[in-house]
Amino acid sequence: VSNAEDYMRFALMLWNEGEYNGQRIVSPDSIALMRQPHIQTGVLSNQVDGMGFGLGVGVVMDAEKTILLDRESDFFWSGFYGTNFFVSPQSGLVAVIMSQNQPPPASPWPGSFGVFIAPAFGFLGI
């Protein structure tokens, strides 16, 4: 349980390799370990093409295979009711959305706000 401001601080700290507002919170090695895929492809039945699972975050492993985020090394996490964050180290984009919507099919909201913001920033080449 948190608020949008704290969630953004957390996401910015991850983007800045463990540092926030000039203070080291987590070592760069720990951040790098978080962002590495740790579950092999095919282990999970609901794994999305091009995506992997790091330690506490989803990671883009093959940008050509995924439609949600477009750069390798992008990472993210989303909650069941639509709260999301993602970090794109290469583009410098850090985003947080706080929502409370049931996932499809109960709601038309697709569950990942990357579907909406990626085209807005040209990530999908659309």
Please state what every model-predicted region is.
Residues 1-126:
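Catalytic loop of the DD-peptidase/beta-lactamase superfamily, centered on the K-T-G motif
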